[in-house]
A protein has these predicted regions:
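Membrane-embedded alpha-helical bundles that constitute the cytochrome b-like, heme-associated redox core
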Residues: 2-17, 203, 212-396
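Extracellular-facing/secreted segment signature in eukaryotic proteins
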Residues: 13-238
Length: 396
C-alpha cells in the first residue's frame, strides 16, 4: 500500500511538472537602445499558449502575429489600460493591411507571478523630448490560439510543435507619443493607429512546445542578469520604419482649401468683381478638395471605426463634397444664362448662399476631423488661424 501511495505521488508530481520549453525573439533598436521582446510556450495539449511581450512604453501599442503577413492571421495586440499603468491584451484577426478586428474565439488571461518583474504594467522612467521612457510588459495565457484549434481554416493561429522547421511571425509597434496619441484603454476593441515600425522573424515551434504530461508557463528571462535573449528563434528581417502621411495630407489640404482658397475666391468676386478669377480659384479649390476626399476614403477603409462611413465628420464631409460639385454646376449654368439674358436667375441666388454655407460647414467639420482622427490638440491652432482669416475678410 505504501509503495502504491509513493507511486501515485510520483505520478502526480510528474503530471504537474513545469516545462521550461520556450522560444524567445528579441529585436534591439540600435538607435534608441530599446528592445522588443516576444517569448512564447505552447501547452503539451496544444490548446493554450503562454506569452511574454514587451516594448518601449513610448509606443501606443505592441503586437505579434502568426504567419508571414497580415492576411488572415491571428494577432495579439497589447496596449496600456485606462489608468495608464496596467495592460490590456486584445486577440484580433487581421484580414490584410487594415486595422485588425477583435475576435472572441480566442481568450487571453493576464498572468501574474513573483518571478515575473513588472508584469502587465507600464513602467515610466520619465520623458525625453516628446517620448516616454519606459517599458510596457504583458504576460498572459491565451486559450484556443493555436493553429489546430483555429475555428476557421483560413485563419493562421500560433503554431504548435510538429517539426523542427522554423515558423514565421510578424511584429509591429504603434506610433509614439508625439502629439499625445498614446492609447490607454480597457476595451478589447479599442481603435488603433497605424504602426510606425514592423518586421518579421521566425521561431521554432517544437522547442516552444512543452513535453507530453508537463505544464507550460509564461517564458521566464533566460539570462543571468534576468533579461531575455534570442533563443530558438531567428533575428528580425524585412524590418521597416513606417510613417503614414495620408491623414496629415488629407487634413492639411482640406484646411488650406476651406480656410484660404475658397474665401480668397469669394473675395475676388465680392471686392474686385473678377468673375473669371473667382471661377479659376474655386475650381482649383474643388480639385484639391476632390483629391483630399479620395484620400480620406482610402484612409477610412483602413480603420474599424471609419470603414462604415457613419461618423459625423465623414457624413458632413460627403455632403460638403456633393454640395461643392452642385455649386460648380449652378455657377456655370447661372453664368451662361446671365450672359444670354442679362437677368439674375434662381440658380444664381442658390449659388450665392450655398457657397458661404458650404465653407461654414467645412470650417466646422475640420475640428470634428481632428477629434475623430485622434488629434484634438490640432483644434486650437486651427481655430486661431481661422479667426484671423475671418477678421481679415470682415475688414475688407
Amino acid at each position: 500500500l505504501l509503495a502504491i501511495s509513493v507511486l501515485t505521488l510520483a505520478l502526480r508530481t510528474t503530471a504537474a511538472s513545469i516545462s521550461n520549453a520556450s522560444a524567445v525573439f528579441v529585436y534591439n533598436d540600435e538607435q534608441s537602445n530599446e528592445q522588443f521582446v516576444f517569448a512564447y510556450a505552447v501547452d503539451s495539449t496544444g490548446n493554450d499558449i503562454y506569452i511574454h511581450m514587451s516594448a518601449p512604453a513610448g509606443n501606443a501599442w505592441m503586437a505579434v502575429g502568426a504567419g508571414s503577413s497580415m492576411k488572415d492571421t491571428l494577432m495579439l495586440i497589447a496596449y496600456a489600460s485606462k489608468n495608464g499603468t496596467g495592460m490590456t491584451l486584445s486577440p484580433r484577426i487581421a484580414t490584410g493591411h487594415s486595422e485588425p478586428s477583435y475576435t472572441d474565439k480566442v481568450s487571453c488571461v493576464l498572468v501574474y507571478a513573483d518571478d515575473l518583474e513588472n508584469g502587465n504594467t507600464v513602467t515610466n522612467y520619465g520623458y525625453q523630448g516628446s517620448g516616454l521612457l519606459g517599458t510596457m510588459t504583458v504576460n498572459a495565457v491565451c486559450h484556443n490560439a493555436t493553429t489546430d484549434q483555429s475555428k476557421s481554416p483560413l485563419i493562421a493561429g500560433f503554431p504548435v510543435g510538429a517539426s523542427d522547421d522554423m515558423s514565421p511571425f510578424i511584429f509591429a509597434v504603434g506610433p509614439g507619443t508625439v502629439g499625445n496619441n498614446n492609447l490607454q484603454s480597457n476595451s478589447l476593441t479599442a481603435s488603433l493607429r497605424e504602426h510606425d515600425f514592423y518586421g518579421q522573424f521566425s521561431m521554432n515551434a517544437t522547442a516552444a512546445t512543452a513535453p507530453t504530461g508537463s505544464q507550460a508557463q509564461v517564458p521566464r528571462p533566460n539570462t543571468a542578469n534576468n533579461n531575455y535573449t534570442l533563443a530558438n528563434a531567428d533575428a528580425a528581417y524585412a524590418t521597416h520604419a513606417d510613417n503614414d502621411p495620408a491623414p496629415i495630407i488629407h487634413a492639411g489640404v482640406m484646411c488650406i482649401t476651406f480656410v484660404f482658397i475658397y474665401p480668397l475666391g469669394a473675395m475676388l468676386l465680392r471686392i474686385l468683381n473678377k468673375v473669371k478669377s473667382h471661377a479659376v480659384i474655386q475650381c482649383i479649390g474643388l480639385v484639391l478638395t476632390t483629391m483630399a476626399t479620395a484620400g480620406g476614403i482610402v484612409i477610412s477603409s483602413k480603420y474599424n471605426k471609419s470603414k462604415n462611413f457613419n461618423s459625423a465628420h465623414q457624413v458632413i464631409g460627403i455632403l460638403i463634397f456633393l454640395a461643392l460639385w452642385a455649386q460648380l454646376t449652378l455657377g456655370i449654368l447661372n453664368h451662361r444664362t446671365f450672359k444670354k439674358t442679362g437677368q439674375k436667375t434662381t440658380m444664381g441666388k442658390v449659388h450665392l448662399y450655398l457657397g458661404p454655407a458650404v465653407i461654414l460647414l467645412g470650417w466646422i467639420n475640420a475640428p470634428l476631423g481632428f477629434v475623430f482622427g485622434g488629434n484634438p490638440h490640432a483644434c486650437l491652432p486651427y481655430i486661431v488661424i481661422l479667426l484671423a482669416v475671418i477678421m481679415i475678410y470682415i475688414s475688407l
